[in-house]
Amino acid sequence: MLLDKSRAWLEQDNRAVGVHASDIMDPLQAFWRSIAPQPLTDREVGLFLPGKVLHAFVLGAVDDQKVIDLAVTDEGSFYSKELDIYFSPDKILNGKVRELKTSRSFYEPVDVEDIDTYVEQLLIYMAATNTLASQLWVLYLNVKDGDGNTAPAFRAFDVKVTQAELDEVKAYIKSTVNSIHQAIKTGVPDLPLCREWKCGRRRCPWYDRCKPPGRYGTTEFDKMPGPPKVRRSKKT
């Protein structure tokens, strides 16, 4: 019952028909989502729910709300005519996009590669809003200290690009959008593979229909998770 309620809450917002910012990063899933829509999997519900609730609390605190509105978890949906994509930034403050992420990582990032998936999405928002500077907010839920103890930690990172770099991002987005539209029109998904952590029988409901080349048929991507191991106390 709780799982069903959570799924209904996460899916309550109507998704506009078209290409969304998240589709740019995983174009094959965008194709399959368009031709064979699927509800959120149980795993996705469990992953998305805590982050969405925390979004409401953090963004509400930024707006100095006395009572947190759980229905407000981003700035709403926008459309970029230039790029032909829909996008929903978490916050636009003083003209700059601020994107909030929650992370279960035990360690803070050492370099940009440790937060590259977050930065990729933020760059798309920057392209859609035609801005050269933004901020990435990350709420780390379990950062370890020197003694191995864990505690939440909030970090903010400035992200800046040159106009030439922004134009390069825009060109990539436009090319990917055109490819997605063409794939949907023809029914032939001649598209780049999704990111590895979004691919596989355990992670993608379309995996057995998509059969991504180089991945399908391999143990790494084919395997399903086994039953969770439950620690049991010894009998006395």
Where are these regions (language model features)?
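Metal-dependent nuclease catalytic cores that hydrolyze phosphodiester bonds in DNA/RNA
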Residues: 1-97, 104-110, 116
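A residue-level signal for conserved active-site and pocket-lining positions in enzyme catalytic cores
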Residues: 26, 125, 204
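Metal-dependent nuclease catalytic cores in nucleic-acid-processing enzymes
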Residues: 56-64, 113-142
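A structural signal for short, well-ordered beta-strand segments and their strand-loop junctions
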Residues: 92, 96-100, 133-139
